[in-house]
């Protein structure tokens, strides 16, 4: 990587809300499996095949360290660049260059867009040597993103937008405390122009073993079992089943290969607020997840253009105070917004921070105070959404202590 790359302790990949919140804790995207912000695995794997040889660009095939497995050779990471709304990785060798961009739709001037439960992974492959190359790109996200513990069971299915897995309404909003992850609702993957697959670690290892070739039939062995709303059930710790997709194309000196993967999460109900199960802001006016997710798929290009324009605007303002200040903002912007959940209660917005530890509390003043400047600048309504629940709670009988 370039010596000047800014490398924070954790690099944002998927930043939607406190539960759908995945980061890379390593300098290279392929050094370790991506993780939830609590530190637990939310594995994602990326494999690129170039002229019959497999390279790994994201995560690990075998996520259990005690299970010895010779991982595919990584495609060397050349750089990682952060902007307020995007993380851009570049990989390459003497034949091809692969650029992978993780984008969050976190624009504070548009609450519908900011609260949208979707995140983008866009990739582009180009020929470096000017020659023609056959390329296959495979990307997955594991069902770990839909459970609190790997002993839990998930269901898999397919719908008009793509494929999904999860636990539905089972156990919804029944846990509180430290070190918890969502274990209800549905994790979704959509990938236009890709082949959908559902595989586990064993499937991936079998497909990659014995030869340098990625055996596509083994990657698709479960695909034929799926039809609309038909479920396959599997325990997460039994092989870490994943939602996956792959695409094959050719690149040369003129033609590049591109692909778009959209990750989404339908949490059904988001927060229990004074005894009432409250929904996310994006659900207001009766909107369904399928409708909102389809809109996220269709609007990628427009969202990408808007986020890039915002990034440039913020960069121009921040660089007045120095490059290091801008680097910090590139991490803090997504971290702060995705540490909150935006809901609507009786026509009023509520914007809750969520602790991953510190008792797992929401709406804590010690988090609200330092984060307020961001929202005063870009969306003061969210400041009201932070403070109103605190006043509501303080006015009630639940808090009986003489201190704040």
Which stretches of residues belong to each language-model region?
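Short, solvent-exposed loop/turn segments enriched in Ser/Thr/Gly
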Residues: 115-120
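A short, sequence-level motif marking secondary-structure junctions
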Residues: 60-65, 102-107, 142
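An alpha-helical repeat/solenoid feature that recognizes helix-turn-helix modules
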Residues: 363-369
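Helix-terminus loop motifs that line ligand-binding clefts
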Residues: 35-36, 47-92, 382-404
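Well-ordered alpha-helical scaffold segments within catalytic/enzyme domains
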Residues: 18-26, 46, 91, 122-127, ...
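Acidic/polar, glycine-enriched structural segments that form the non-catalytic walls/loops
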Residues: 2-9, 106-113, 124-363, 380-384, ...
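Beta-strand-rich N-terminal accessory domains
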Residues: 1-61, 75-79, 92-100, 111-113
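Short Pro/Gly-enriched beta-strand edge/turn motifs at strand-loop
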Residues: 67-73, 100-106, 228-231
């Amino acid at each position: 990587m370039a010596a000047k790359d800014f490398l924070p302790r954790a690099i944002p990949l998927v930043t939607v809300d406190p539960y759908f919140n995945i980061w890379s804790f390593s300098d290279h995207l392929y050094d370790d499996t991506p993780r939830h912000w609590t530190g637990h695995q939310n594995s994602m794997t990326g494999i690129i095949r170039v002229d019959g040889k497999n390279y790994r660009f994201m995560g690990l095939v075998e996520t259990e360290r005690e299970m010895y497995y010779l991982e595919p050779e990584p495609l060397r990471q050349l750089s990682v660049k952060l902007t307020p709304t995007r993380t851009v990785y570049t990989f390459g060798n003497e034949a091809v260059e692969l650029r992978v961009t993780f984008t969050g739709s976190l624009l504070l001037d548009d609450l519908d867009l900011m609260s949208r439960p979707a995140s983008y992974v866009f990739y582009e492959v180009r020929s470096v040597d000017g020659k023609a190359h056959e390329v296959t790109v495979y990307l997955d996200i594991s069902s770990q993103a839909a459970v609190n513990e790997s002993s839990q069971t998930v269901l898999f299915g397919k719908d008009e937008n793509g494929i999904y897995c999860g636990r539905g309404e089972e156990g919804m909003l029944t846990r509180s405390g430290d070190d918890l992850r969502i274990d209800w609702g549905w994790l979704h993957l959509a990938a236009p122009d890709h082949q959908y697959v559902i595989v586990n670690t064993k499937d991936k290892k079998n497909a990659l073993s014995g030869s340098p070739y990625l055996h596509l039939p083994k990657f698709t062995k479960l695909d034929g079992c799926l039809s609309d709303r038909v479920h396959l059930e599997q325990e997460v710790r039994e092989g870490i089943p994943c939602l996956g997709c792959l695409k094959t194309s050719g690149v040369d000196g003129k033609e590049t290969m591109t692909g778009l993967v959209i990750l989404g999460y339908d949490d059904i109900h988001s927060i229990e607020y004074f005894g009432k199960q409250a929904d996310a802001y994006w659900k207001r006016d009766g909107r369904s997840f399928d409708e909102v997710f389809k809109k996220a798929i269709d609007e990628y290009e427009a969202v990408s253009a808007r986020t890039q324009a915002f990034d440039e605007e913020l960069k121009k303002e921040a660089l007045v105070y120095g490059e290091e200040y801008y680097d910090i903002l590139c991490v803090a912007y997504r971290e702060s917004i995705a540490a909150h959940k935006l809901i609507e209660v009786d026509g009023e917005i509520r914007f809750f921070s969520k602790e991953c530890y510190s008792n797992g509390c929401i709406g804590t003043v010690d988090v609200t105070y330092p984060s307020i400047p961001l929202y005063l600048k870009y969306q003061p309504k969210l400041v009201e959404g932070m403070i109103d629940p605190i006043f509501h709670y303080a006015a009630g009988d639940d808090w009986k202590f003489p201190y704040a």
